[in-house]
Amino acid sequence: MIQFRKATLEDLPLLKQWDEDPSVIDSDPMGEWDWESELSKDPDWREFLIAEADGIPIGFVQIIDPQVEETHYWGDIGAGFRAIDIWIGSPAYRGRGLGTAMMKEALRRCFAPADVHTVLVDPLASNTGACRFYERLGFDFLEDRMFDDDACRVYAIARATWAQRHA
């Protein structure tokens, strides 16, 4: 069973270790997270979460409200959206269905507020495995888009699609 808990400064060594994993690097090559700084902040528009399986930390999830996120990464976007970043940190936990369980829990969390109508993800275009993963979960491809220097594929899942597939 997957459970989320808030990421804290105590998770710093683990997050830094995961950042060195080649699969994590491949999924976010420009992702130079300043963990010390980011973990000490707690803005209303973001959740940093550690995913645990049977009490063992296995991955990381970030959920943001892109309308109010401070860097405006998603550009000018309306209300009712959430965006997710997700990865499994340790190779030992990949390929076991845990990523699917993590994403389903993240989506449940995103759609808990009644005003959220759409969840976005932006895997690298070169990360075809991640693209297939999101498609299997019911995400629809929206567009190819450059985020900084990264060529990404933007996917979205609407509340109605999620409710139909995962209710």
Residue locations for each model-derived region?
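A conserved short alpha-helix in the GNAT/GCN5 acetyltransferase fold that borders
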Residues: 103-111, 135
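Acetyl-CoA-dependent GNAT
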Residues: 36-93, 109, 159-160
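Conserved beta-strand-loop-alpha-helix junction that forms the acyl-donor binding cleft
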Residues: 120-131, 147-151, 160
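A short, well-structured alpha-helix characteristic of acyl/acetyltransferase catalytic modules
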Residues: 1-39, 58, 163-167
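Conserved GNAT acetyl-CoA-binding A-motif
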Residues: 112-122
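Conserved acetyl-CoA pyrophosphate-binding loop and the N-cap/start of the following alpha-helix
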Residues: 93, 97-106
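Conserved active-site alpha-helix within GNAT-family acetyltransferase domains
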Residues: 100-101, 125-143
